[in-house]
Regions:
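Conserved active-site neighborhood of the chymotrypsin/trypsin-like protease fold
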Residues: 45-46, 63-146, 180, 230, ...
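Gly/Ser-rich catalytic serine loop of serine hydrolases
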Residues: 57-61, 121-125, 142, 171-188, ...
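Short, conserved beta-turn/loop elements at beta-strand boundaries and strand-helix junctions
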Residues: 81, 100-104, 154-162, 240-241, ...
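N-terminal activation segment of mature serine protease catalytic domains
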Residues: 21-60, 69, 73, 82, ...
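C-terminal recognition in membrane/secretory proteostasis and scaffolding
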Residues: 28, 74, 96, 110, ...
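Conserved hydrophobic positions within beta-strands
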Residues: 61-63, 95-97, 153, 187, ...
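Active-site loop architecture of trypsin-fold serine endopeptidases
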Residues: 46-56, 80-83, 117-118, 138-151, ...
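Bacterial N-terminal signal peptides
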Residues: 7-18
Length: 341
């Protein structure tokens, strides 16, 4: 007996439909991805009212290449003196920053070596993610390593719409729990592929309130892998006209006040000096005594827009190329020279 034409038509339609992988349970996703997730412990120093103090920052990250590249958040590692990375099996290796973009809260670090058993994560096209999609975050909230939280994509935000200090970041908003220690960790889709890097949450209580923000993988790949944003290893702030007057900066000079410099960073190698004392002016705390950067490569360092131009230029330079910085130090204008790492 020959099949009826209608049955043949239905069969043809079914065969033409795309085949999708079976949905994985949260436990299956967790077991699949944890060999690629790392816990980051970074040591730095800061100036407080009590003087120079050491501190430890704990965050998370994800291994994205066989040669040891790990994506994480800039605020976890960008101005730290020492970075150690712990894998699922407990093995710890040293790492260094090789690219960073504070305007998107992203950093790329390179491991001294890749432990046996570590697994490179698969990165997904974050443009295909939709509001309502299930997501999973693995990290170390409050130092509790390899904790899983689950949720949904709540919204998607274009660059320069959520956080003025991070104008380059496209964000996913999620109700998956994000706490201190999750920063820099990966957010996975239901297939266990990385779709973003955890940045921060918005909270009135200090805990997680369902407003978590994750930088999309599209932004991370563009800034860290394609563009390789320059890492200088410095932290500081632009000086207002009021502060320029208070500090008696001559000739209407404007610039960027250096608060701290990471040991071994390009800024450190160039001879930049960080602050030494904390002062309160108009209710706001400043770490003073450090260099004021007036220009880098001849471009004034007087605003966020000018710093973007500087970063774009530095990203085009090859390793070993010289970098010049004009700084004001104790009333004297100096020219410092460093090199691209």
């Amino acid at each position: 007996m020959r099949p009826a034409p209608a049955i043949l038509l239905v069969a043809a339609v079914l065969l033409s439909l795309p085949v999708t992988a079976a949905a994985q349970t949260p436990g299956e996703v967790f077991r699949k991805v944890t060999p690629s997730v790392v816990v980051i412990k970074a040591r730095g120093s800061e100036v407080t009212a009590a003087g120079q103090t050491r501190f430890l920052e704990t965050g998370s990250g994800v291994l994205i290449s066989a040669d040891g590249k790990v994506m994480t958040a800039a605020h976890v590692v960008a101005t730290m003196d020492e970075i150690s990375v712990e894998f699922l099996g407990g093995e710890t290796v040293s790492a260094k920053v090789i690219a960073s973009e504070s305007a998107a809260d992203l950093s790329l670090i390179l491991l001294e070596r890749v432990p046996a058993g570590a697994r490179v994560a698969k990165m997904a096209n974050s443009d295909t993610v939709r509001v309502g999609d299930p997501v999973y975050i693995v990290g170390a909230p409050y130092g509790l390593s390899y904790s899983l939280s689950a949720g949904l994509i709540s919204a998607r935000w274009a660059p320069n719409t959520v956080h003025r200090a991070m104008p380059l970041a496209e964000f996913f908003q999620t109700n998956a729990t994000i706490n201190t220690g999750n920063s820099g960790g990966p957010m996975f889709n239901a297939a266990g592929e990385v779709i973003g890097i955890v940045s921060h949450n918005i909270s009135k209580s200090g805990g997680s309130e369902g407003l978590g923000f994750v930088v999309t993988m599209k932004t991370a790949q563009q800034l860290l892998l394609e563009k390789k944003s320059f890492w200088g290893g410095i932290d500081g702030q632009f000086l207002s006209d009021e502060m320029l007057d208070i500090l008696n900066v001559p000739n209407n000079m404007k610039g960027f006040l250096v608060k701290s410099v990471a040991k071994g960073s390009p800024g450190d190698e160039a001879g930049l000096v960080g602050g030494t004392k904390v002062f309160t002016v108009g209710g706001e705390q400043f770490v003073l005594g450090g260099d004021i950067i007036l220009a880098i490569e001849g471009v004034p360092a007087d605003s966020a827009a000018s710093m973007m131009k500087i970063r774009d230029h530095l990203a085009t330079l090859k390793p070993g190329a010289p970098i010049t910085a004009t700084v004001l130090r104790k009333g004297r204008v100096l020219e410092l020279t460093g090199v691209v790492p």
